[in-house]
Amino acid sequence: MKERLKKLKILFLTNNQITNPLYLWLRKKAYIYKFTKPLNKTILQKINPDIVISYNYRYIIKKEFLKKYYFINLHISYLPFNRGAHPNIWSFIENTKKGVTIHLIDEGIDTGDILVQKRVVLDKNDSFKSTYKKLHFHIQMLFKQNFKKLINKKIKPKKQPKNGTFHLSKELPSIDYNKPIYKVLKEINANRKT
């Protein structure tokens, strides 16, 4: 396995500093290339990655790339709930299951087959800022625990259930990320009634 890891090439797609602990961990395991811009054919051909990891990456990946390379996404929701933007917050607003999911990437947004997922207990007395950090901690731990299986494609993907939810950034009301969640939810509900 060590020989395989030395030769393993990973393309790490991200747009957020919260992903750095996982990126640094991966640097010890394989050749890793961090990329923050829209993915293009040139970078894929140059690196020719064994696996492409999308983690807090804001750009849509072209269908033609998905056919040729192995893409996975790390998403901080318990799919199929809260696909898209701000899954942490929507899980409280809509009172859906909370957790983290690693899934294959397909043409949709967070709709690919599920590889692994984990429920996470979050408290309404915490803030959205602290629960966001907690979910990122859990997604990174889930990835590390399943790293060898993920890179060797030893996990059988399962189709996502048809139900679920999807949200865009513009749908989110203005909120204070540092307030206790229960207070923010009261404010959101009060604003919806007016």
What are these regions (language model features)?
Residues 1-194:
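One-carbon transfer enzymes
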